[in-house]
């Protein structure tokens, strides 16, 4: 038992003090990237995206003691609403989540698939 305890103490001493979380911290109309070391109490990197009717999108990134993500479905953020994204590893809030850029492509893919199925149905059963 003493050996295990000594091993754990030695391992803790060798590891040194824990590193503070690093997040991008900024406010911008685009995907800003400004790394900053967070305070020891911060456990999350938080990104808040607000959709403003007159000024467009506003992106705020910061360190946060707590974070509650919103449950908006992909591409479902309306004007005047905001989406909160949370993560907890170094510089994890660099990129905005893929739903923002992927939603138009996904919509186009669904439309293309629907058109292809419709054409296939017309060719398969021309008497309908």
UniProtKB/Swiss-Prot annotation:
Q: Which SMART domains match?
A: LU
Q: Give the disulfide map.
A: 23-45, 26-32, 38-63, 67-86, 87-92
Q: Where in the cell is it found?
A: Cell membrane
Annotated signal sequence is 1-20
* Matches recorded under PROSITE patterns: LY6_UPAR
Q: Which GO terms describe its biological process?
A: lymphocyte differentiation; response to stilbenoid
Removed propeptide positions:
99-128
Q: Which InterPro entries match?
A: CD59_antigen_CS (IPR018363), LY6_UPA_recep-like (IPR016054), Ly6D (IPR042339), Snake_toxin-like_sf (IPR045860), Toxin/TOLIP (IPR035076)
UniProt keyword annotations, A-Z: Cell membrane, Disulfide bond, Glycoprotein, GPI-anchor, Lipoprotein, Membrane, Signal
One cellular component (GO) term of this entry: cell surface
Per the record, the major location class is membrane
The UniProt entry, under SUPFAM superfamilies, shows:
Snake toxin-like
Task: Tell me how this protein sits in the membrane.
Answer: Lipid-anchor; GPI-anchor
UPAR/Ly6 domain ranges (all copies)? 21-108
Lipid-acceptor residues (GPI-anchor amidated serine): 98
According to its UniProt entry, the function of this protein is described as:
May act as a specification marker at earliest stage specification of lymphocytes between B- and T-cell development. Marks the earliest stage of B-cell specification.
Q: What is this protein called?
A: Lymphocyte antigen 6D
Q: Which gene encodes it?
A: LY6D
């Amino acid at each position: 038992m003493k050996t295990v305890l000594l091993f754990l103490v030695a391992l803790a001493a060798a590891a040194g003090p824990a590193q503070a979380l690093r997040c991008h911290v900024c406010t911008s109309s685009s995907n800003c990237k400004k790394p900053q070391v967070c305070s020891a109490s911060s456990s999350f990197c938080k990104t808040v995206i607000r959709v403003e009717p007159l000024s467009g999108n506003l992106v705020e990134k910061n360190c946060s003691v707590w974070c509650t993500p919103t449950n908006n479905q992909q591409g479902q953020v309306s004007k005047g609403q905001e989406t909160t994204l949370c993560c907890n590893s170094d510089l994890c809030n660099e990129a905005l989540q893929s739903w923002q850029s992927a939603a138009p492509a996904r919509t186009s893919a669904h439309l293309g698939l629907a058109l292809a199925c419709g054409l296939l149905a017309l060719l398969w059963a021309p008497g309908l």
